[in-house]
């Protein structure tokens, strides 16, 4: 028997007879041995008390036979159930999440669709306390709402800067999916300025692959420092299953709406009085523009702020209040958080020449031709 055959025979014998061999131990790679493993636990411990569970009860108009899924506002918003035989008043109980943004005064940010039509709102803190909440204000176009509780010992989250986010940044979602309290999932920023899901809404979503499910609505999307960068609001799915495409409202948008809701109880949007189309490559070529950018004015309301400022159909708006307008979505969002009476500068191109105009926003409604995106001035919503 050659040495190789002898070695094989010895191995077979050992396996068959159960002769003990030297124990094997899992070992850490040399690069991490003796050093702490990376963990998000300290950040989560800091942020988690600022995330709350929100349960609501109310009555809404429903169609057709009773379906428990249709009592979930998240489901109804994104996975519309089949139409039934007619509307009827239906009591509902639903759940979502929220984020404490002001510990002193008890203000909590959440989604509008979490508290819409609610007659009773209950906030459950991480420490188990159940608190009655009142609705401060709701803004359906941005899907943002603010509720308030009267309590001591609250923990508020630190507001970050969503304009500094970049694709590839790590983010963490915290909420109460399916009633599982303070569930934490992680991922990255998969995309920015996502829009086009609804022609009637303000859309400037952060896209993330951090898992978002029913009950996460209104919860926190934070960066690795624990700063709030978004309010989780939706997923993209044909079946209702999470496929790794979730969306959050940027905190810059949420904070702007929040301030107006707290101060005024509603968002008083200034109107410009124009309807615009996106500048496509074909439109840019026909207008002699170097690139497809800006919002092409399709129509101006007579007597509107735009009309008084001298804007005309065919003008291309390139900036509002110093903010570049690369698309009609940018224009809509730029105007969407300005108030009645605000004066804004409008940079535009007319016959290939750059001009600047000033307009004082009013509450004038804009025309909305078929296919046009009129922006907030045409009462488009998120």
Outline where the language-model segments fall.
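Conserved catalytic motifs of ABC-family nucleotide-binding domains
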Residues: 314
């Amino acid at each position: 028997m050659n040495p190789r055959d002898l070695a094989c025979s010895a191995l077979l014998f050992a396996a068959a007879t159960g002769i003990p061999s030297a124990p094997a131990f899992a070992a850490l790679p040399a690069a991490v041995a003796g050093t702490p493993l990376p963990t998000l636990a300290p950040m989560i411990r800091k942020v988690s008390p600022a995330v709350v569970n929100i349960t609501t009860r109310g009555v809404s108009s429903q169609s057709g036979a009773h379906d428990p899924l249709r009592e979930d506002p998240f489901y109804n918003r994104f996975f519309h159930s089949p139409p039934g035989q007619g509307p009827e008043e239906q009591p509902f109980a639903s759940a979502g999440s929220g984020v404490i943004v002001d510990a002193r005064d008890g203000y909590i940010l959440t989604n509008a669709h979490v508290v819409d039509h609610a007659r009773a709102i209950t906030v459950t803190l991480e420490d188990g306390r159940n608190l009655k909440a009142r609705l401060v204000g709701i803004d359906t176009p941005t899907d943002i709402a603010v509720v308030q509780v009267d309590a001591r010992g609250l923990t508020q989250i630190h507001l970050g800067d969503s304009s500094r986010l970049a694709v590839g940044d790590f983010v963490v979602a915290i909420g109460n999916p399916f009633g599982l309290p303070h569930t934490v999932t992680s991922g990255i920023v998969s995309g920015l300025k996502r829009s086009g899901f609804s022609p009637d809404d303000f859309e400037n979503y952060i896209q993330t692959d951090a898992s978002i499910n029913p009950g996460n609505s209104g919860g926190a999307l934070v960066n690795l420092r624990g700063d709030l960068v978004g309010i989780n609001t939706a997923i993209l799915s044909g079946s209702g299953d999470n496929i790794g495409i979730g969306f959050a409202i940027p905190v810059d948008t949420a904070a702007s709406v929040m301030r107006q809701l707290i101060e005024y109880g509603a968002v008083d949007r200034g109107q410009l009085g124009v309807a615009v189309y996106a500048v496509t490559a074909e439109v840019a070529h026909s207008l002699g523009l170097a690139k497809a950018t800006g919002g092409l004015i399709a129509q101006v309301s007579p007597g509107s702020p735009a009309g008084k400022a001298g804007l005309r159909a065919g003008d291309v708006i390139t900036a509002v209040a110093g903010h570049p307008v690369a698309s009609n979505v940018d224009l809509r969002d730029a105007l969407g958080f300005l108030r009645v009476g605000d004066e804004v500068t409008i940079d535009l191109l007319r016959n290939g020449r750059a001009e600047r105009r000033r307009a004082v926003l009013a509450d004038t409604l804009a025309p909305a031709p078929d296919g046009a995106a009129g922006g907030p001035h045409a009462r488009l919503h998120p």
